[in-house]
């Protein structure tokens, strides 16, 4: 009995040790499963951490508790790593975009200073635009804008085209259209040159940037500048200051007329293609303004002599500008009314000539057709006589004579037709 009790007591600690080892293995597996579940569900470590019993006596239970705490700590660290990765992945596209934009801007700046050596390296590039320069052909390239320079570069068929315009030399920046339909072009004009840039994808932003660069154009609007031009300044400098009121008013009217003419001239120059009619109208306006100036000077001479004797009242002095404008408008209407009847008469004359030529061509065509029919009838008659019976020699000679006469008439008519055709062609060429 004592031996059996000793065997039972020996087997009990072995069983207890086996149970403890199985508990440790299950604890390890549960810890791994707990880590995976924490990765998926991202639970807090306090929710899954077991409450260790205060009454942990054996070292095995202490080991189990330490394993549970380690697994919970690992799960919490993995969850925090996941959150950090998510925040970094959200911030990455913004930083990448900033880096790419800064790198592209840096490359464009380097390319700009490499192309245009006249621009100082301390002056950075503001922005570049893809566009085309309109000349005899379209030169596709890029427009570079900096603080003090407007530059263009193009390489077409192996030919480099470089244009550098100082911002202070620009006198006009204007929006325009290509083919009178598509509003995608800009005009940049200086004192000596005029450039048209087309195929702009963002014309408004380009226009605003160019206006901001050329700040001296903001004070003066296009065509209506408050400051007079150099010609007007010189004209006013030569004019004496001791003039009567009516003389000053007349010249102020002339200044208004000159400004209006300048607007018309700029309107003609802004159009892409200039016709001979527009050039003639420019010459006409120039000569007309000169005549108005001469007339006003001729009228001003007697007023100088009588300036100190007779002073014009204020009401009359104010009414003089209106009279001067009405006189200029009357001169314009008279000249136009004189030109219009002449043009109408010329057009009517050309229309009559063309109608006469058309009628004569139809008549000549009719005559040729009738002669051809007569020739066909004669040849058919001759053939029938030859086949049916042998005609006498006298008749044959007469028929041959008639045929020769007809041939001569036909040749003479053909020569006349050729002469008429040549005359018609000359008239048409003169008419064109």
Swiss-Prot record:
GO cellular component: cytoplasmic microtubule
Location of Phosphoserine modifications: 225, 242, 252
Residues bearing the modification N-acetylmethionine: 1
Residues passing through the membrane, by range: none
Molecular function GO labels: identical protein binding
Biased composition (Polar residues): 220-233, 268-278
Matching CDD domains: PH-GRAM_GRAMDC
Positions of the GRAM domain: 110-177
Keywords associated with the record: Acetylation, Phosphoprotein
Residues covered by region (Disordered): 1-61, 74-106, 220-239, 262-285
Positions with biased composition (Basic and acidic residues): 9-39, 81-99
Domain of life: Eukaryota
Pfam short name (any one): GRAM
PANTHER family: GRAM DOMAIN-CONTAINING PROTEIN 2B, GRAM DOMAIN-CONTAINING PROTEIN 2B-RELATED
Protein name: GRAM domain-containing protein 2B
Lineage: Eukaryota, Metazoa, Chordata, Craniata, Vertebrata
Gene name tied to this protein: GRAMD2B
């Amino acid at each position: 009995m004592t031996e059996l009790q000793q065997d039972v007591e020996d087997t009990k600690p072995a069983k207890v040790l086996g149970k403890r080892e199985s508990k440790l293995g299950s604890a390890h597996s549960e810890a791994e499963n707990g880590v995976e579940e924490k990765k998926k569900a991202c639970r807090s470590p306090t929710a899954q951490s077991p409450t260790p019993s205060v009454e942990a006596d054996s070292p095995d239970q202490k080991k189990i508790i330490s394993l549970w705490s380690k697994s919970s700590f690992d799960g919490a660290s993995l969850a925090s790593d996941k959150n950090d990765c998510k925040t970094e992945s959200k911030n990455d596209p913004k930083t990448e975009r900033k880096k790419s934009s800064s790198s592209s801007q840096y490359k464009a700046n380097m390319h700009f200073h490499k192309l245009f050596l006249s621009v100082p390296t301390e002056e950075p590039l503001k922005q570049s635009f893809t566009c085309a320069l309109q000349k005899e052909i379209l030169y596709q390239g890029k427009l570079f804008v900096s603080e003090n320079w407007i530059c263009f570069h193009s390489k077409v068929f192996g030919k480099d085209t470089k244009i550098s315009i100082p911002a202070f030399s620009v006198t006009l920046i204007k929006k325009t259209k290509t083919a009178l339909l598509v509003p995608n072009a800009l005009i940049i004009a200086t004192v000596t040159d005029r450039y048209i840039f087309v195929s702009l994808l963002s014309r408004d932003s380009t226009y605003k940037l160019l206006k901001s660069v050329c700040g001296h154009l903001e004070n003066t609007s296009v065509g209506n500048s408050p400051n007079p031009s150099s010609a007007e300044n010189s004209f006013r400098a030569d004019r004496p200051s001791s003039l009567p009121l009516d003389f000053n008013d007349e010249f102020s009217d002339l200044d208004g007329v000159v400004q209006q003419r300048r607007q018309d001239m700029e309107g003609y120059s802004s159009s892409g293609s200039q016709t001979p009619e527009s050039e003639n109208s420019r010459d006409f306006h120039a000569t007309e303004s000169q005549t108005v100036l001469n007339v006003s000077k001729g009228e001003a001479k007697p007023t100088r002599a009588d300036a100190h004797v007779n002073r014009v009242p204020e009401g009359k002095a104010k009414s003089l500008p209106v009279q001067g404008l009405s006189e200029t408008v009357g001169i314009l209407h008279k000249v136009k009314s004189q030109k219009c009847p002449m043009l109408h008469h010329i057009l009517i004359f050309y229309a009559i000539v063309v109608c006469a030529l058309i009628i004569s061509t139809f008549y000549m065509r009719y005559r040729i057709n009738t002669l051809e029919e007569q020739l066909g009838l004669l040849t058919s008659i001759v053939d029938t006589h030859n086949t049916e019976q042998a005609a006498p020699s006298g008749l044959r000679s007469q028929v041959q004579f008639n045929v020769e006469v007809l041939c001569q008439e036909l040749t003479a008519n053909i020569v006349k037709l050729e002469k008429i055709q040549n005359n018609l062609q000359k008239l048409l060429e003169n008419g064109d």
